[in-house]
């Protein structure tokens, strides 16, 4: 008998295990919750582990805000060796004798590393060209031209240097490819490198939140599974809040522009007494509040 899917709304902070694709991990979460709709907010390679926010139900409407969020990673890179994929997916194709590197020299290189630079995405990535992910071209031995993308590095912190393995944490903007960062950093140190370990520690704004493993979720009762979910609006903590007066609620929920006493322009989270979170709106000149993204009445009651 096929289990009936149901409406489940919220965000699960999954600790994706090694060896499992992001899509595969989401499928397991979707099955555990018997959810009609689920999606992740920024894939992790099978050889990476860690924070993977999974949006269920109406939370999927706001997943793009997590795609745009800053992320923090714990990185292990092996210096003096290069692979075609820049990680452990492919064999070593080049080795170099390591230059004399001290922890102090590496600290200096981390401090001097550009905080904003144009990074060329790797061929071994999920970015698509002509409808196919780049890694499919790479596995067929085809190299495609890739446009450099501006990324931001907010923090680089050395954890340990025990040659040839370099351990560091990085907090960066969306779109940053850590395997390319490791290669670029190695080049500044006069050598080559590839990733041997990668763990995503957090995704803003959830950096301090605990993560759930699949094994822990599988052991939970139905009520405990529900309690593990963050509310739909958790992804929007950084947005300004606006409480809508009762007189404008129905029109707003029907997608109509309503008046507001708040005339500061910008995107806001909208709430109503007794209903909670309604969605996102934009305050425009003359105190006009325009609906941008609304959740269903069912999700309000969930």
What spans do the regions from the language model cover?
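Catalytic cores of RNA-modifying enzymes
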Residues: 1-174, 178-212
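Accessory RNA 3′-end/elbow-binding domains used by RNA modification enzymes
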Residues: 1-44, 48, 104, 188-302
């Amino acid at each position: 008998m096929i289990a009936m899917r149901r409406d489940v709304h919220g965000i699960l902070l999954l600790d994706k295990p090694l060896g499992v694709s992001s899509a595969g991990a989401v499928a397991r979460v979707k099955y555990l919750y018997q959810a009609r709709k689920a999606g992740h907010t920024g894939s992790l390679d099978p050889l990476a582990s860690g924070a993977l926010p999974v949006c269920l139900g109406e939370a999927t409407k706001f997943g793009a805000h997590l795609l745009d969020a800053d992320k923090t990673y714990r990185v292990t890179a092996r210096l003096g060796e290069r692979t075609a994929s820049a990680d452990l997916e492919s064999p070593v194709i080049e080795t170099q004798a390591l230059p004399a590197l001290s922890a102090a020299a590496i600290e200096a290189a981390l401090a001097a590393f550009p905080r904003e630079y144009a990074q060329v995405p790797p061929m071994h990535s999920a970015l698509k060209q002509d409808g196919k992910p780049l890694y499919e071209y790479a596995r067929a031995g085809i190299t495609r031209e890739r446009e450099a993308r501006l990324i931001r590095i907010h923090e680089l912190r050395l954890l340990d240097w025990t040659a040839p393995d370099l351990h560091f944490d990085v907090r960066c903007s969306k779109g940053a490819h850590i395997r390319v960062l490791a290669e670029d950093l190695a080049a500044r140190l006069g050598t080559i490198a590839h990733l041997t370990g990668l763990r995503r520690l957090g995704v803003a704004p959830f950096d301090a939140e605990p993560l759930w493993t699949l094994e822990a979720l599988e052991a939970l009762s139905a009520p405990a599974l529900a309690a593990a979910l963050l509310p739909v609006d958790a992804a929007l903590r950084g947005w300004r809040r606006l409480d809508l007066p009762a007189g404008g609620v129905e029109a707003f929920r029907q997608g109509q522009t309503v008046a507001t006493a708040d005339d500061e322009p910008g995107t806001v989270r909208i709430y109503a007494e007794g209903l909670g979170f309604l969605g996102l709106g934009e305050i425009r000149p003359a105190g006009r509040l325009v609906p941008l993204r609304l959740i269903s009445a069912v999700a309000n009651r969930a």
